[in-house]
Structure formats: C-alpha cells, structure tokens
Amino acid sequence: MGNEERELPNIIICGTPGTGKTTLAEQVAETTELENICIGDVVKENHLHFGFDEKWKTYDVDEDKVLDYLEPKLLKGGCIIDWHTCGLFSEELIDLVVVLRTDHSKLWERLESRGYSLEKIQENNEAEIMQICLEEARESFDPKIVVELPSESIEEMESNLSRITQWVTNWKKNH
C-alpha cells in the first residue's frame, strides 16, 4: 500500500537522545490525528528486545520484532515514530523524516540532567557532532522527505511543531 492509499501520513522524528524527539512527537500527536509511537516504550511493553544492556542502560532491540509489530500500523498510516534511528523503516511507508539537531554543549547538559553515564553522554555527543542520525536519514530516504530542524530553544521547538502541523495539513489536502 503506497502513501496515496493512506488517509494519514507516517512521520519519523529522529535524532540523538536529548534532542527533543519525544517532546515534539507528543506535541504533534496532540495537534494532529496522528498516533505517537515511542519505540523505546513499545520495545519495553511488548518485549521486542533480546535483553537489557547493563553497560549502556538500554534494551538490545530486536529490530525484526519491531518491524513486525509496526508494519500493520504503518500500512494504515497516521503514525509518528519517535526513535533515535530511522534506517530500519521502509521508504514506501514513510512520508516525512524529521531529524532534530542540538548544539553539543546543550545536548551534554540535557543528557547529564537525565543521569546518563559520562561514557553514554560522550558517545551520544559524538554522534550528534558527527551527524550520525542526519546521515542515516539522508542515506535511507529520498532527500526530499528529510528535514533537519534545530531543537535548542522553546522558540525553535514551537516553530518545529508549527511546521510539522502545517505539513500534515498540506499532506492531507494532497492525498
């Protein structure tokens, strides 16, 4: 089923941990008809993992199980996927990929306030500096559907919400 057969679009909001994905995804879900799907929560609640990695304090995600779980929802449309990565998803099922970016010093503060270990903060900060999420999005999807947005201030976050909400409105008019 292509996007021309869905009534609502599918959006991925991705970025390094601490860039504001969950906040933005929740806000977009509140202002549109889309369902926010936080992959971290889905993985935990549905046991879509191989176990917990004590060193990194995160689940070792079973990507095949995640895809099996999500595919029916994505085929129907109307999903906001909130995850740090995007390359797992089929290009035919995704209409917009939003990559949130944050200055590494601000990102460091956010991750520190979450209680992340120094090693985890450094790894995520390096990923942000090296633009890992952005490069993955550009390699995995048509560049026309990949949007890079800054996410450092309240004003930027409000602007991002407005832009995505308007995009959803336009998508619905054209499909």
Swiss-Prot record:
Disulfide links within the chain: none
Gene Ontology cellular component? cytoplasm; cytosol; nucleus
Keyword list (alphabetical) reads: ATP-binding, Cytoplasm, Kinase, Nucleotide-binding, Nucleus, Ribosome biogenesis, rRNA processing, Transferase
Entry keyword annotation includes tRNA processing: no
**Which reaction does this chain catalyze?**
AMP + ATP = 2 ADP; ATP + H2O = ADP + phosphate + H(+)
Segments of this protein annotated with the region LID: 113-123
Keyword Transport belongs to the record? no
- What subcellular locations does the record give? Cytoplasm; Nucleus
- Any Pfam family: AAA_18
Q: Which SUPFAM superfamilies match?
A: P-loop containing nucleoside triphosphate hydrolases
E.C. number(s) listed in UniProt: 2.7.4.3
Report what the protein is called: Adenylate kinase isoenzyme 6 homolog
Q: Which organism is it from?
A: Schizosaccharomyces pombe (strain 972 / ATCC 24843) (Fission yeast)
Gene that produces this protein: fap7
